[in-house]
């Protein structure tokens, strides 16, 4: 089971030769659970609906110098709202000590595992992850996996790590 958690999210079952199953990611509006875009969407929603502490809301508005109408404009009227929302991930990473933000990430990863990974044979095969979101929040991803009974294999930040290993390590040592 191979999963990508970056700006968007995706998953598939790869049999060693080809992809034999894929749960459609559906994009950040209908799916993309666990992605940077969805984490950003959840963060903005929680901030604008006063679900996080006043200190976090103030820090967010100060750091990004945005008003609520400007955020709405960026999401609904400007191109590439998914990229804008995903660009908020570093703020999330900086504020993981805030229980509401940590819970936001954990719940999104649990949703990704349930709605995507658990549609494959996750009992027999571990799920391997690649992408900046998977890597940066790997401890929370492990917690979500433990809660859902999904076994995690490798978590890589970039595909280059695996490609370099594949092309430099003898085949019998991969």
Model-assigned labels for residue ranges:
Residues 1-55:
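Phosphate-binding/catalytic loop of phosphoryl-transfer enzymes
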């Amino acid at each position: 089971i191979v999963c990508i958690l970056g700006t968007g999210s995706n998953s598939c079952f790869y049999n060693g030769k080809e992809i034999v199953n894929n749960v459609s990611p559906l994009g950040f509006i209908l799916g993309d659970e666990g992605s940077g875009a969805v984490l950003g969407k959840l963060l903005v929603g929680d901030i604008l609906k006063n679900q996080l502490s006043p200190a976090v809301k103030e820090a967010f508005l100060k750091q990004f110098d945005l008003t609520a109408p400007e955020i709405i404009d960026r999401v609904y009227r400007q191109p590439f709202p998914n990229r804008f929302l995903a660009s908020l991930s570093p703020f999330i990473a900086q504020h993981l000590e805030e229980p509401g933000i940590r819970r936001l990430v954990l719940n999104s990863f649990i949703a990704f595992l349930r709605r995507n990974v658990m549609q494959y044979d996750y009992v027999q095969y571990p799920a391997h992850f690649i992408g900046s979101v998977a890597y940066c929040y790997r401890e929370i991803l492990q917690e979500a996996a433990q809660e859902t009974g999904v076994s995690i294999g490798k978590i890589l930040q970039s595909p280059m790590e695996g490609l370099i290993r594949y092309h430099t390590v003898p085949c019998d040592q991969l």
